[in-house]
Structure formats: C-alpha cells, structure tokens
Amino acid sequence: MEWVWALVLLAALGGGSAERDCRVSSFRVKENFDKARFSGLWYAIAKKDPEGLFLQDNIIAEFSVDEKGHMSATAKGRVRLLSNWEVCADMVGTFTDTEDPAKFKMKYWGVASFLQRGNDDHWIIDTDYDTFALQYSCRLQNLDGTCADSYSFVFSRDPNGLSPETRRLVRQRQEELCLERQYRWIEHNGYCQSRPSRNSL
C-alpha cells in the first residue's frame, strides 16, 4: 500500500512542476515568420479585448509589404460610441521589425481622432498563412513578468471561420498564452460593407 501513496505523491509533484509559465518572455512565436506570405486579407473571427475603446465586430484587416520589406496594415470594424451610436471605424498601422521576425512594434491610429492610438508589441504567435493566424499584444506587464493588459486576435482567411482541427490547434496556443476562455467570437454580417458613408469614420 505504501508504494501506492508514493506514486500519488510523485504524480502530485510532477503536476506541480508542469505548471505553465505565464511570463510574456516565455511565449513562443511563429518560427521563421514570412511577412510576404502573411500579407493579404484576414478576417478577425475571435478576440480577447484590452482596456479601452476597441473595434467590436465585422473586423477585416489587410496586411501589405512594400518594396523595402516594410509591413503595414489597414483595418475596418464596427465600434459602439456613447452606448448607442454604432459606426464603422478605419484603423491604420505600421510595423517596425525587431530581431525576431515574428515580433514587431506596431504604431497604430484611428482615422477619427478619438479612436485609440498607440505603439504596441505585435507578435504573430502562429499561422499557416493560408487559413489561420493568432496574434498577441501585451501593453503592460506586471512586476512578475506576466501581462496586465493584453489583446489578441484569431484571424481566418475565410469569414466563415476555421475547421475543427485548426480550432483545436488555436485553442492549444491560446492556453500557452494563458488566455484560455478569454476570447469571444466576432460576428461578420456585412455591417461595414453595407453602411452609408455617414456611418463611417
């Protein structure tokens, strides 16, 4: 009987040592990230929100790379202002390379002056370029190196979403970011494609 308790104790010790490392510096990103393959149209199908005003749904982003290899992006999505005023907002972003090809500094701003602007880390956690991408940004770190204010997008080339197999892979990577069950699905109903110009910013 003693050996049974010994096995239980070993299992408990093993489980404790296998705890996730939620420090931002420990997060894996896409190896050998290729900006050119990543360029093009992406539909945001799920997101983890940061603090503050943020695009809510119908979010479409288009990434491009110029002849000098610099990446930029434009995005459009629905945002709610003053509780009941819904508009389609345009955002612009430029990216500065770092030593890691999957980690960028992203300077972004809204075409309308009251929309958010900033200069955030922008990491590509994973992508296969053809179907899905998982992006992550940490705006503020705690003293222990974990993230105090983050946001993350799940992108798809198809507005209808991802296959079950790809969703399982994305969920695994979300867990590695310590963000499981913190995402919400994003609706795509053509809202920003059907709005008159007076409802756009």
Curated annotation (Swiss-Prot):
Signal peptide bounds: 1-18
Modified residues (Omega-N-methylarginine): R139
Pfam families: Lipocalin (PF00061)
Known partners and oligomeric status: Interacts with TTR. Interaction with TTR prevents its loss by filtration through the kidney glomeruli. Interacts with STRA6.
UniProt keyword ATP-binding present: no
Stated name of the protein: Retinol-binding protein 4
UniProt organism field: Mus musculus
UniProt cross-references to Gene3D superfamilies, sorted A to Z: 2.40.128.20
Lineage summary: Eukaryota, Metazoa, Chordata, Craniata, Vertebrata
GO annotation, cellular component aspect: extracellular region; extracellular space
One MF annotation (Gene Ontology) recorded for this entry: retinol binding
